[in-house]
């Protein structure tokens, strides 16, 4: 199939949130399945120096009364074709924000539609979040192009209808209060980035006032879990780590822990329980819960905490104050540093994600991949990826709590601290967590089924021998015929 991804981000060149990871990693996984996958993103200013871009545009047109050009380049990691929408409104280093944000992305969506109609015509146009929300609206009456719309974060919904009427042409049939709502109405298929989140957003607690619409379109709504690039995020080959390690030999984690303690100004002690946190410092990520329990946690236990990220100024200031009050035990680094984030994943004993809501979450997957045990709230994709630890039967991959309350979070922290004191069981917990492999290959197969469904392509029924071969992972064995498979 011919598949065109339209998005505001694409890792590693342009990345602000999880959407960038998805758009950078899912297309090559789909390519391995035999599809012709290409991407189209805004031609941001810094891309012209980062990438080798053809000097002449491959397409020129006019939309919303504005001329634009489309240039072609290649993804630096996987070589997939990338189309850049060139216009002065994208020339600055800024990706989001600014008074013209609504106009910029509405213009981008319109330019993508013109390109898909008149240049490279896909069978499936896969749109991501509100920035591309007008594409399904404009494509609604084109029977040759099917649209898929992915909800990465329902909280961000785009410009309202009255503003859209002022900046562009809205079809007479368009309904919906804003870009996100309109996209969900007119896309042929809609998906959220985890099964649990796809159910949560149909409730008033997580629906962001769109739960009624989401229940209305539930027949075309599904949840597909994000994955991780297992080659890029591999502790056995990660050159950012002082000591590499694998699930077969995790002794290198002790060296990484020592280096992490030294770099973050903590007491260097291998026996101290070290918890890490990486991400945006905003309310969604549960920073307020950490602030409420930190004093009690550091008074009751001998734990250490490291935090890496930027965000809300008040939260940054509060975390900095804790670092001043607890030198050698609480450390905060108010920036984003990829190498340091990998050191936290590969050196911390546990990883904190007490999220208020979490559409999918990538950090908990990376933490488990690197042997840091996640401590998470049972919400969104965290439910789908972290199995609660059960010390009685030695199962699970992390510590989970239900309510968004300080006491619940604190209880999980103390439980994990106590579990860490039993090193044999803790190491087994680490090995179970590291054995989880949430790859993009598995996610790509689910997206492929959705694409085929929306295009009316039916899967052929395999013969019995193929089914048996798939079930057992080997050539069909007549001696096993009729035996039950343990799932």
UniProtKB/Swiss-Prot annotation:
Keyword Nucleus among record annotations: no
CDD domains registered for this protein in UniProt: GT5_Glycogen_synthase_DULL1-like
Pfam families noted in UniProt: Glyco_transf_5, Glycos_transf_1
Pathway: Glycan biosynthesis; glycogen biosynthesis
GO molecular function terms noted in the UniProt entry: alpha-1,4-glucan glucosyltransferase (ADP-glucose donor) activity; alpha-1,4-glucan glucosyltransferase (UDP-glucose donor) activity
Matching InterPro entries: Glyco_trans_1 (IPR001296), GS/SS (IPR011835), Starch_synth_cat_dom (IPR013534)
Swiss-Prot/TrEMBL catalytic activity: [(1->4)-alpha-D-glucosyl](n) + ADP-alpha-D-glucose = [(1->4)-alpha-D-glucosyl](n+1) + ADP + H(+)
Binding site for ADP-alpha-D-glucose: 15
Superkingdom field: Bacteria
Disordered: region residues: 468-487
Keywords attached to this entry: Glycogen biosynthesis, Glycosyltransferase, Transferase
Family as reported in the entry's similarity comment: Belongs to the glycosyltransferase 1 family. Bacterial/plant glycogen synthase subfamily.
Purpose: Synthesizes alpha-1,4-glucan chains using ADP-glucose.
Entry protein name: Glycogen synthase
Organism phylogeny: Bacteria, Bacillati, Cyanobacteriota, Cyanophyceae, Synechococcales
Encoding gene per record: glgA
